[in-house]
Amino acid sequence: MFRLGVFLLTFLLLVSMATSEYSRGRIMARASECVNECVESGHNTFHCERHCSNT
């Protein structure tokens, strides 16, 4: 019974870590997409990074 509890806790911890890494990855990808679109429309990279981190 104790082993099962430890296993479940470990499993849940791994799942939550994987989920947060995934969502952080999605946010980073969205930010770089934002910067790329912004630069393509003629702004400089610094402006775009600031603009994209605010949204």
Swiss-Prot record:
What is written about domains in the entry's comments?
The cysteine framework is XIV (C-C-C-C).
What name appears for this protein in its UniProt entry?
Answer: Conotoxin Cal14.14
Q: Which cysteines are joined by disulfide bonds?
A: 34-48, 38-52
Can you say where in the cell this protein is located?
Secreted
Output the lineage of the source organism.
Eukaryota, Metazoa, Spiralia, Lophotrochozoa, Mollusca
Signal sequence, renumbered to the chain: 1-20
* Any one of the GO CC terms: extracellular region
* Main localization, broad class: secreted
Q: Which GO terms describe its molecular function?
A: toxin activity
Please indicate which superkingdom the organism of origin belongs to: Eukaryota
Query: Does the record bear Signal in its keywords?
Result: yes
Kindly state the tissue distribution recorded for this protein. Expressed by the venom duct.
Q: What does this protein do?
A: Probable neurotoxin.
